Swiss-Prot record:
Function: NDH-1 shuttles electrons from NADH, via FMN and iron-sulfur (Fe-S) centers, to quinones in the respiratory chain. The immediate electron acceptor for the enzyme in this species is believed to be ubiquinone. Couples the redox reaction to proton translocation (for every two electrons transferred, four hydrogen ions are translocated across the cytoplasmic membrane), and thus conserves the redox energy in a proton gradient.
InterPro entries, sorted: NADH_Q_OxRdtase_suD, NADH_UbQ_OxRdtase_49kDa_CS, NDH1_su_D/H, NiFe-Hase_large
E.C. number(s) listed in UniProt: 7.1.1.-
Superkingdom of the organism of origin: Bacteria
Protein name: NADH-quinone oxidoreductase subunit D
Keyword ATP-binding belongs to the record: no
Length: 417
């Protein structure tokens, strides 16, 4: 009988499929994985500790840099925790804007995941297609916040500002004709809501394109079907949330089970898998993009018909307008004090969670009555998913490690924090 010699293999952190700085120490027996030991900490930046030394409103930007593909969803969890401490509720228009931007973020995340996952297992065309649509949504980010990635758009008590009436346009260039320029700017003549309306009309056809490339592709199915399945019971025990939990057949979604923002006012479905394998997790995320379009469309229609304030009318947390600040010395002082010293919150502890694209993103805040947190604890979904790597990959091939990591959709900004 042939004997296999076991050996140890380092997968990452310098590996194109490691999704950041993941280091997996694999114990191999031939091509089969006998054990996988994830090593984390290579992207540790002490976010939770840094937040303890800054006023509440100065730590919003740190949240963007946790899961740096799901920026506004991270902000949402943090500002919800602050709002719970303060006992305030944002205006309804702000709630709808948050809901809409959360779903824009979900599509952004899933497009990045689908392109990267496809590239990992050899489907390069999907990568080129997904980034075409992703660029449109990055422009929405830029229009509402001024930044393409680290938006810092949400605020305790609402959002930074109302949705702008104009979308950024492409400038003339020597590399594109006037006809191409007109076509590229066709949907950008109106407001952000007009642009999103147009996006919602054409994006389902784009998702159909992705599915044409992948869903019934025999190579794609050979790489994903029956790879690293997890049962519903075991997924719950392992602390899975988001698409991984729903891919295993558990219909748990905070947007439905514990509604926040305007999710109880919009209609959408929760996609659920059957087999809990990598292929089901793929199907769940693709269907989530379709459901996000439904939610965005409903939010756009409501926001068109219902103008109103986007920040709570409370000078304790809301700065004066720019006009007031430039006309009135007291408003200028108020603005300066608010952004340098912040505001004190009542003593207590709260936990606030949102359904981020990767799962439940939670923020646990402890206040001692000061203007900065006594303790901030972030509950990132990817941390729990990565912890199950060893159990999920045992007995599978080395090539399946790449499939599993892509299927988990790990981002190390939130794992290492």
């Amino acid at each position: 009988m042939a004997e296999f010699q076991s050996y140890t293999l380092n997968f990452g952190p310098q590996h194109p499929a490691a999704h950041g700085v993941l280091r997996l120490v694999l114990e191999m027996e031939g091509e089969a994985v006998r054990r996988a030991d994830p090593h984390i900490g290579l992207l540790h930046r002490a976010t939770e500790k840094l937040a303890e030394s800054k006023p509440y409103n100065q730590s919003i930007g740190y949240m963007d840099r946790l899961d740096y593909v799901s920026m506004m969803c991270n902000e949402h969890g943090y500002v919800r925790a602050i709002e719970k401490l303060l006992g305030i509720e944002p205006p309804l228009r702000a709630q709808y804007i948050r809901t809409m931007m959360d779903e824009v973020t979900r599509i952004l995340n899933h497009l990045m995941w689908l392109g990267g996952h496809g590239l990992d297992v050899g489907a390069m065309t999907a990568f080129l297609y997904t980034f075409r649509e992703r660029e449109d949504l990055m422009d929405v980010y830029e229009a509402v916040s001024g930044a393409r990635m680290h938006a810092t758009y949400y605020r305790p008590g609402g959002v930074h500002r109302d949705l702008p009436d104009q979308m950024p346009k492409y400038e003339p260039s020597a590399y594109r004709s006037d006809k191409e320029l007109r076509e590229m700017n066709r949907a950008r003549e109106g407001s952000v809501l007009d642009f999103l309306d147009d996006f919602c009309e054409r994006f389902p056809a784009c998702v159909d394109e992705y599915e044409t490339l992948l869903t019934e592709n025999r190579i794609w199915k050979q790489r994903l079907v029956d790879i690293c399945p997890v049962s519903a019971e075991r997924a719950v025990e392992l602390g899975f949330t988001g698409p991984l939990l729903r891919g295993s057949g558990v219909a748990w979604d905070l947007r439905k089970k514990q509604p926040y923002a305007a999710y109880d006012r919009v209609d959408f479905d929760i996609p659920v898998g059957v087999n809990g394998d990598s292929y089901d997790r793929y199907l769940v995320r693709v269907e989530e993009m379709r459901q996000s379009v439904r939610i965005i469309k409903q939010c756009v229609d409501w926001l068109r018909a219902n103008p109103g304030p986007v920040r709570i009318d409370d000078p304790k947390v809301t700065p004066p307008t720019r006009e007031e600040m430039k006309d009135d010395m007291e408003s200028l002082i108020h603005h300066f004090k608010l952004f340098t010293e912040g505001y004190c919150t009542p003593p207590g502890e709260v936990y606030a969670a949102v359904e981020a694209p990767k799962g439940e993103f939670g923020v646990y805040l402890i206040s001692d009555g000061a203007n900065k947190p006594y303790r901030l604890k972030v509950r990132p979904p990817c941390y729990y998913h990565l912890a199950a790597t060893d159990e999920m990959i045992r007995g599978y091939m080395l090539a399946d490690v790449v499939t599993l990591i892509g299927s988990l959709d790990v981002v190390f900004g939130e794992v290492d924090r």
